[in-house]
Amino acid sequence: MCLATIYGKKQEDETILLKNASRIDVDGTTIRIRDIMGMEITVEGAITMVDLANSVVRINCADN
């Protein structure tokens, strides 16, 4: 199983949005992320990097 840590970045600040992510769905700028326990978050932005070897996904979050 490939699980990832999702990092969100707004301007210069980067934070962990979710650990142990098992699913990512993208619809335009809406990104839905679900972890292995079924918890789901939704963020607006764009995926900027996916590193499957190191289980990292980086998202530039939209300014709201």
Give residue ranges: language-model regions:
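Short loop/turn microsegments at loop-to-beta-strand junctions
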Residues: 28-29
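C-terminal structural segments of small proteins and small subunits
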Residues: 10, 39-64
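Short, acidic, Ser/Thr-enriched surface-loop or helix-capping motifs
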Residues: 35
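N-terminal acidic leader/helix
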Residues: 1-25
